[in-house]
């Protein structure tokens, strides 16, 4: 699927078509990453999708999660599950293997770690970097996003990975953390 493919006399770009499809399903950001160097991945390609959190909900989170945030968290997880499941069906319908990492499929160990975290896929797919708050930070939405991922063997054109934090001297998340739990370390 790299580059343009001639189909019926019309040049097609399968990677762009897939990305456009994921956006049509509700993803605000879509990144495609090379996972061949990631030991915990059984698939060579990872697709990360993100949906921003509404600003008014973030403003209300200053001291503790609110009921509205919890409801939104659940709603956005359901929406992300639907988006990556649709992507899985799109790719398997074209003869590729695909695995949507939905909330009901991901397993975690006793330390609450998953074999292939969404944020690992997201950095490999160029969506952003891991900030001093240990969250994915995107240029478009900061860390106010929910993310999910989809794994595949489809030969999609990968985006450039983000390999360094862009936080620099910024300490805003450390300064504003109400629990003072952040230690100002870069990933």
Regions flagged by a language model, labelled:
Residues 8-82:
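Non-catalytic, usually N-terminal nucleic-acid engagement modules in DNA/RNA processing proteins
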Residues 38-41, 69, 75-187:
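Catalytic cores of enzyme domains
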Residues 3-5:
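Short hydrophobic alpha-helical segments enriched in small aliphatic residues
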């Amino acid at each position: 699927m790299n580059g343009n493919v001639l189909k019926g006399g019309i040049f097609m770009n399968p990677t762009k078509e897939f990305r456009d499809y994921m956006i049509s399903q509700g993803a605000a950001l879509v990144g495609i990453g090379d996972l061949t160097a990631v030991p915990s991945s059984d698939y060579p390609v990872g697709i990360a999708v993100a949906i921003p959190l509404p600003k008014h909900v973030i403003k209300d989170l200053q001291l503790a999660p609110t009921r509205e945030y919890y409801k939104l968290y659940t709603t956005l997880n359901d929406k992300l599950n639907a988006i990556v499941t649709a992507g899985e069906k799109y790719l398997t319908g074209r003869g590729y293997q695909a695995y949507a990492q939905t909330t009901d499929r991901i397993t975690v160990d006793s330390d609450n770690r998953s074999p292939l975290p969404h944020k690992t896929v997201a950095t490999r797919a160029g969506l952003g970097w891991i900030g001093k708050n240990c969250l994915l930070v995107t240029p478009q939405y900061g860390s106010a996003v929910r993310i999910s991922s989809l794994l595949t063997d489809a030969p999609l054109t990968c985006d450039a990975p983000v390999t360094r934090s862009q936080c620099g001297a910024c300490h805003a998340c450390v300064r504003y953390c109400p629990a003072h739990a952040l230690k100002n370390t870069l990933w």
